[in-house]
Amino acid sequence: MDVENEQILNVNPADPDNLSDSLFSGDEENAGTEEIKNEINGNWISASSINEARINAKAKRRLRKNSSRDSGRGDSVSDSGSDALRSGLTVPTSPKGRLLDRRSRSGKGRGLPKKGGAGGKGVWGTPGQVYDVEEVDVKDPNYDDDQENCVYETVVLPLDERAFEKTLTPIIQEYFEHGDTNEVAEMLRDLNLGEMKSGVPVLAVSLALEGKASHREMTSKLLSDLCGTVMSTTDVEKSFDKLLKDLPELALDTPRAPQLVGQFIARAVGDGILCNTYIDSYKGTVDCVQARAALDKATVLLSMSKGGKRKDSVWGSGGGQQSVNHLVKEIDMLLKEYLLSGDISEAEHCLKELEVPHFHHELVYEAIIMVLESTGESTFKMILDLLKSLWKSSTITVDQMKRGYERIYNEIPDINLDVPHSYSVLERFVEECFQAGIISKQLRDLCPSRGRKRFVSEGDGGRLKPESY
């Protein structure tokens, strides 16, 4: 009945103000109104009581809904709830009052883990918390007793022949740059060489044959350091057996391969990584001409070492390890051999073999000294052709050429004491070099010239001095 009464009141609200416009008036109107209200209520409950009950119920619902949200506010709804109930009015809850409130409006939070909590949602636990060891269930259908004492280890597959050459070639080429044998040994230990250990000396020697003398010296040192750590003496013997077998193919790319391999064998015997009877084991059993030449070269070097020559000097000392006096002698011999043979390409090759590009100014200096001390035109022309060829091939750089000429310019007064006509010869040679494009105009203009000596009787301007007595 209450629900039906509320629906009827919603459709036809019994407002006393609105009933004032009815057709009845006076006491009849009031009596009719009270009779209608009593009929509508049914239970003889006044309409004002129903309206007041509805307002109070609505205020209670709002109070329960907002109690959790506004629990932290200073002026909560509960403080004013009793006043609202007593007055019959609702307290408006505008969203503007919660504009800067960072708390969740649903009252449940965002579901994030606790900050600094121990064991909350998404947290591993307190620092230092030890978890229990997971015990294996023996009755588990998937239980395997072999897994209890199982030790796992990283397995590196052995290298095949193609991967071996592709992997080790950059390692050896980088070694020629830094020269650190320990780094190469560490990198080789990380690889599973397997049966390819004997291929390390073969590949290193093959690359050194195409390089310089310093590279061959570094290769001999590398083989000596790797023997005993990465490979054994047996692996070294197998590698040199393969080198002697492959000498015909190596000689196609490097004609001097037989002599160089013989030097490698002699150095290996001297370092103790090859036995002394290695060469004797090949006597009378070698049919290859190149292999026989290599063994003969090694035999000669070993016999020389018995007479006092060190076996570690088979490659010489290359690059900056050579002394200045030794380099000066080598350059002087190079120029003298060139003047005898006239072979410019051989002279250029010998200069590159010295591996001292920072010392090429010495060749320019010694060559010009030979021109100044010569008496014929052949030396003048041959030295000019040599410097021109070295300049065009960029064997001698601009700085080295300039430094060699400047040394001559600074020492020409002392040279002139031993060579009287050195000034005139130098001026002529410098002019020819400028015409050939060897030196620049600025360097030519720096050439010193010696003026004509005046006689005692000549004064300034060539006039005779007046008698002063």
From Swiss-Prot:
The modification Phosphotyrosine is found at Y152. Changing E249A: Reduced interaction with EIF4A1. GO terms for biological process: apoptotic process; BMP signaling pathway; cellular response to lipopolysaccharide; epithelial to mesenchymal transition involved in cardiac fibroblast development; negative regulation of cytokine production involved in inflammatory response; negative regulation of DNA-templated transcription; negative regulation of JUN kinase activity; negative regulation of myofibroblast differentiation. It is found in: Nucleus; Cytoplasm. Changing G120R: In a breast cancer sample; somatic mutation. Keywords: Acetylation, Apoptosis, Cytoplasm, Nucleus, Phosphoprotein, Repeat, RNA-binding, Tumor suppressor, Ubl conjugation. Changing E337A: No effect on inhibition of EIF4A1 and on inhibition of translation. A motif (Nuclear localization signal) lies at residues 58-64, 241-250. Interacts (via MI domains) with EIF4A2. Interacts (via MI domains) with EIF4A1 (via N-terminal domain). Heterotrimer with EIF4A1; one molecule of PDCD4 binds two molecules of EIF4A1. Interacts with EIF4G1. May form a complex with EIF4A1 and EIF4G1. The interaction between PDCD4 and EIF4A1 interferes with the interaction between EIF4A1 and EIF4G. When phosphorylated, interacts with BTRC and FBXW11. This is Programmed cell death protein 4. It comes from Homo sapiens.
